[in-house]
Amino acid sequence: MKELISSGLEALGLTGSVPPDAAEKLAEYGRLLLEKNQVMNLTAIRDEAGVARLHMLDCAALLPCADFSQARTLLDVGTGAGFPGLPLKILLPQLDVTLLDSLNKRVDWLNEVSAQLGLTGVRAIQGRAEEKALDKSMRDSFDLVTARAVADLRLLSELCLPFVKVGGRFLSMKSVDSDQELDQAAHAIKLLGGRVRDVKDYAIPGADVTHRLVIVCLLYTSPSPRDTR
């Protein structure tokens, strides 16, 4: 798996800009994922090549698509098995990463994996996005918020934009067949203070797959009620 990831990072032009042990850590993460997947439903992908390409390199492909240079904090909403938040942490260790998931057992596993990989500045927490958005310590707090196809873009924007700082960005990983979603989400994004800054389609190295990254900038804090508890 390490060789597939390493060659994929090279194909993406990332070899010199990510830590030298990034491929090794991503491969170890993939190994731990497949091992745990035998007793916990974490991914439908059950082979090393699929995990390398459709999980690790899919997330790594975000780096050429978006500017991460000024970002210091990242929240991954509906992280599941940790995508894309944990690979981004491995590739960009300067990021302070929070992984949000609704299931305690996944959260516990993600914290265990982070420790096994020797990562610091990353935590997994349990909760639902619509509830955590009411928490003063999390609302309007992150430079970047990510989500990987956990819902349609309109709903994702409503769930994710409340966490973004003004001037920050929401990065939504979608399929290339999401044009209708984009159209349907436009009004909600505007009401929430956002604007679609860019839509980038990208190929995953070694896979005959193209995915899409929708980049939404937050221009001002949403006027809709988001009172803290």
Language model feature labels by segment:
Residues V164-K165:
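Helix-to-beta-strand junctions that scaffold the AdoMet/dcAdoMet cofactor pocket
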Residues G16, L95, T120-V122, G168, ...:
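A structural micro-motif
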Residues L4-S69, Q116, T120:
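Class I SAM-dependent transferase core
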Residues A60-A151, S157:
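Conserved SAM/SAH cofactor-binding pocket of Class I
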Residues V209-L213:
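Short hydrophobic/aromatic beta-strand or adjacent loop that forms the aromatic wall/cage
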Residues R169-A203, I215:
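C-terminal substrate-binding/active-site "lid" region of AdoMet-derived donor-dependent transferases
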Residues Y220-R229:
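Single conserved hydrophobic/aromatic residue that forms the stacking wall/gate
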